[in-house]
Amino acid sequence: MSVVLFDLDGTLVDTAQDLGLALNMQLTRHGKSPLPHERIWPVASHGTRGLLELGFAVYPDDSQFEAMRLEYLDLYESVYTQHPLFLPGIAALLAALDSKGIKWGIVTNKPRRFSVNLTKAVKLGDSNLFERAACLLCGDDAPQPKPAPDTLLMACAQMQCQAEQCIYVGDAQRDVQAGRAAGMKTVVALFGYLAETDRPHEWGADALIQTPAALLENLSCCD
């Protein structure tokens, strides 16, 4: 494999603290009690939809969903660069990929309005995640975000590679679905935002890894 593509939240970067902070600000605004971090962590990878379902039991087909979604995004915009950190072992993994000459990029469902500044806020050596990644594709860069393969295929076009040369690493079922639909090998990051009810062994990925370092061991398995 010559290219590794990563999901962002819960795969490369721990953003759960700021996602949860915005949700708790919204809950407080609506007279509800804030939620503890351990309740928020497992759904942090599911974006605004998952967070609103957790906090308010509001779903996309509810009449108030869109207003709640926009309110949440405005609150998140005020806090989203406060606490982002690499998940343990990720900085070392990216350095190892660089040393091996393996190109890597980011494909996320996070809107571009957040993704660019977030990746710029996460330092990697003497630069930052945004500068070091070979590409950054966001959920609103294509008509359909993951689990559709559109943004993954756009990443291939930007990096001038074929999908079969790529591994896509993520922590959600939609990541596996998108990668497989694009014709890529897929790896589940078990260290990410998985809930107890998730069953990653049933998602059809080519490999599951407990730590970022294990990805290096699995590169040959995905050839």
Regions from the PLM with identified roles:
Residues M1-S2, P111-D223:
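Asp-based, Mg2+/Mn2+-dependent phosphohydrolase catalytic module
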Residues S2-A92, S99-K100, R113-V116:
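N-terminal helical cap/lid subdomain that shapes the substrate entry/recognition surface
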Residues L5, L12, W104-V107, Y168-V169, ...:
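Conserved SAM-binding loop
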Residues L8-T11, W104, A133-D140:
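Surface-exposed, interaction-prone regions with an acidic/low-complexity signature
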Residues Q26, Y72-Y76, Y80, G105, ...:
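Hydrophobic, well-ordered secondary-structure segments
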Residues S33, K103, K185:
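Residue-level detector of anion-binding/catalytic polar loops
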Residues A96-K103, Q160-A163:
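Short, surface-exposed connector motifs at secondary-structure boundaries
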